Amino acid sequence: MTRKPVHLALYDTWADWETGHATAHLALAGHEVRTATPGGRPVTSMGGLRALPDLALEELRPEDSSLLILPGAAAWDEGDDLAPAARTARAFLDAGVPVAAICGATAGLAREGLLDDRAHTSAAAPYLAATGYAGADRYVEADAVTDGALVTAGPTEPVAFAREILTLLGAYDDKAVDAWYRLFHDSDPAAFAEWTQAAGR
């Protein structure tokens, strides 16, 4: 059976440091990573990186994907321009296709009502509370949280975010993911050999 691609949503001001660990190590595991932007237009990250997408976000369908990744962006907190991305996340979750959101994207999901009944985390509880959402009692103080098909994380936790994604998609076995996390998060030198051996590299 052909593996469906992972889709990374990009938009102007996206936080380019938040998804690199996840996309790089998904690609190393054989997953195709495709990018989608509003209107299929080129976009520019916070760091000034310009991206040409593979497709328009509006064309993206859950049945054609194995995961939707939503990075943070200043634009999540500057109006409703990214509300369509949150609605796309709703379509994915309704179809049982995983969604992974980090930083400001979690606020977008909160506004869409997608965190009201799911365990989640973000930059801080007050940040999400400011959206007026109804899920404050499901907030978890953790580096990253997976609840069913939804992964959430705060902006300082791109490695934990990637760990949850790699685990959710079964990109590597648990031993390999544990070694990978200790290498990239804890800077454990012993983990390098464990990671390369466990991952078959």
Q: Can you name each region flagged by the protein language model?
A:
Residues 2-14, 24-38, 54-100, 104-201:
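Active-site-adjacent pocket-lining segments in enzyme domains
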Residues 14-19, 44:
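Short N-terminal binding/cap micro-motifs at the start of the first secondary-structure element
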Residues 39-43:
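Short active-site-proximal "capping" loops at secondary-structure junctions
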